[in-house]
From Swiss-Prot:
This is Acetaldehyde dehydrogenase 2. The lineage of its organism: Bacteria, Pseudomonadati, Pseudomonadota, Betaproteobacteria, Burkholderiales. Its EC number is 1.2.1.10. GO terms for molecular function: acetaldehyde dehydrogenase (acetylating) activity; NAD binding. NAD(+) binds at residues 161-169, 272. It comes from Burkholderia vietnamiensis (strain G4 / LMG 22486).
């Protein structure tokens, strides 16, 4: 079976977890890991897995892109550098899957809008944030039943699972997540809050989703819609589960979720890594299947 070759930029928590998932993919083959620190743990681990590495950033990868047939790149660095990375790689015809909150390209939350991206020939799609991937499906589950005037999501993650890149991007995280709660989740107004909890032992990712419906909530239909959506998410993140809810209080619908990871890199408490990396891998696989079938040919993009 032909596989589409990929590069990963950023050998931190997210990049390392993603590498483990891509290694199992039937249509994607990770061939490069890009970092900026020669001593990086993530680069060392990638080399042990037989992946080529460079510590010279994206510029260290560019000369090899065409020779090694790289067609998809995952950016797990920081919102500040993503635009430059994307420009350089898009110019060589490489499609970007953006795991930073840069959000240059359209938002992608697989169970809600993955299919919409097919056939649009986008060269950059944004995976929102871990908080977005965990909560937007729930907002969408309510908004597909009836209009949501306001949605507020709170993502609580363990301190140990949040690396330096994510910490530098907290403001971008909240802005990008709130934007996608509106655009993909379907809420008229969205708000996002992230809590980084330093407790030891580290706690599992928890997410609270509040939706205010415009009219009295149709409890039965909303409950059915939420359960159906949870099953969709579980297809690629089996540790996604409902802890409580939906709880109805007037026009407010509240759902409490917990996300356990597969333990590919950090232990299972780091469900925030899994929901992000599994969504990114799922998205890339869909594009890869189209390329293998001959329905999608990537063209260089001149910025």
């Amino acid at each position: 079976m032909k596989k589409i070759k990929c590069a990963l930029i950023g050998p931190g928590n997210i990049g390392t977890d993603l590498l483990a998932k891509l290694k199992r993919s039937s249509v994607l083959e990770p061939v490069w890991m890009v970092g900026i620190d020669p001593e990086s743990e993530g680069l060392k681990r990638a080399r042990e897995l037989g992946v080529k590495t460079t510590a010279e950033g994206v510029d260290g990868l560019l000369p090899h892109v065409l020779a090694d047939g790289v067609q998809i790149a995952f950016d797990a660095t920081s919102a500040y550098v993503h635009a430059e990375n994307a420009r350089k790689l898009n110019a060589l015809g490489v499609m970007m899957i953006d795991l930073t909150p840069a959000a240059i390209g359209p938002y992608c939350v697989p169970p809600v809008n993955l299919k919409e991206h097919l056939g649009k020939r986008e060269m950059n799609v944004n995976m929102v944030t871990c908080g977005g991937q965990a909560t937007i499906p729930m907002v969408a589950a309510v908004s597909r039943v009836q209009p949501v005037a306001y949605a507020e999501i709170v993502a609580t993650v363990s301190s140990r699972s949040v690396g330096p890149g994510t910490r530098k991007n907290i403001d971008e995280f909240t802005r990008t997540t709130a934007g996608a709660v509106e655009k993909v989740g379907g809420a008229r107004k969205g708000k996002a809050i992230i809590i980084i909890n330093p407790a030891e032992p580290p706690l599992m990712m928890r997410d609270t989703i509040h939706c205010l419906t415009e009219t009295e909530p149709d409890q039965q239909r909303i409950t059915e819609s939420i359960h159906a959506m949870i099953e969709e998410v579980q297809k690629y993140v089996p540790g996604y589960r409902l802890v409580n809810g939906p709880v109805f209080d007037g026009k407010r619908v509240t759902v409490f979720m917990e996300v356990a990871g597969l333990g590919d890199y950090l232990p299972t408490y780091a469900g925030n890594l899994d929901i992000m990396t599994a969504a990114a891998a799922r998205t890339a696989e869909m594009f890869a299947e189209e390329m293998i079938a001959g329905n999608l040919t990537l063209e260089p993009v001149v910025a």
